[in-house]
Design a protein with these regions (language model features):
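N-terminal intrinsically disordered/low-complexity leader segments
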Residues: 1-3
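Helix-turn-helix
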Residues: 7, 11, 15-49, 53
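Alpha-helical DNA-contacting segments of helix-turn-helix folds
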Residues: 51-58, 65
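Hydrophobic alpha-helical connector segments
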Residues: 53, 67-92
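Amphipathic alpha-helical packing segments from all-alpha helical-bundle domains
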Residues: 77, 110-135
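Amphipathic alpha-helical segments used for helix-helix packing
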Residues: 92-113
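Hydrophobic alpha-helical segments that form the core
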Residues: 138-143
Length: 143
């Protein structure tokens, strides 16, 4: 990814998180990122593609951060780590809620890519938690 595309993506993510998807237009993203509208549209054909790209980036970061935090923990210890990670996230000054829930809530039924990305993200989180919940006593009974 080029520096310009990365800057646009990072700026869009910050603005969407700070405000909302519907409140932030491409002109604001262009102005805040310091790129031209032509450059923005070179990398992202429309706002929906930009939103989808932001969600894909956020999903990768979310998964990596959560997996790293859980580390080698298993069973109940892993579930506790998952909750601890979320508590730390919720307590951050810039926390405004889940970007995926917000994107889905602000999208129309025609925004299938955005809705699918939000659904896939939540499904991954469900499966991630479920893998540790299958045998919750395994670790705690060995202590």
């Amino acid at each position: 990814m080029s520096k310009s595309a990365a800057k646009i993506l990072s700026t869009a993510e910050q603005l969407f998180n700070q405000h909302s998807f519907n409140a932030v237009g491409v002109d604001l993203i262009r102005d805040e990122s310091g790129c031209s509208k032509t450059t923005l549209y070179t990398y992202f054909k429309n706002k929906q593609q930009l939103v989808a790209s932001v969600l894909k980036k956020r999903d990768i970061q979310f998964r990596q951060s959560l997996c790293d935090f859980v580390g080698e923990a298993q069973s109940l210890a892993a579930i506790e780590q998952i909750f601890d990670w979320h508590v730390m996230w919720f307590q951050q000054d810039h926390f405004k809620g889940c970007l995926f829930v917000r994107a889905a809530g602000e999208s129309s039924q025609q925004d299938t890519e955005i809705l699918n990305l939000a659904k896939q993200h939540k499904h991954w989180l469900y499966e991630f938690i479920a893998q540790y919940a299958q045998h919750p006593q395994a670790t705690s009974s060995s202590h």
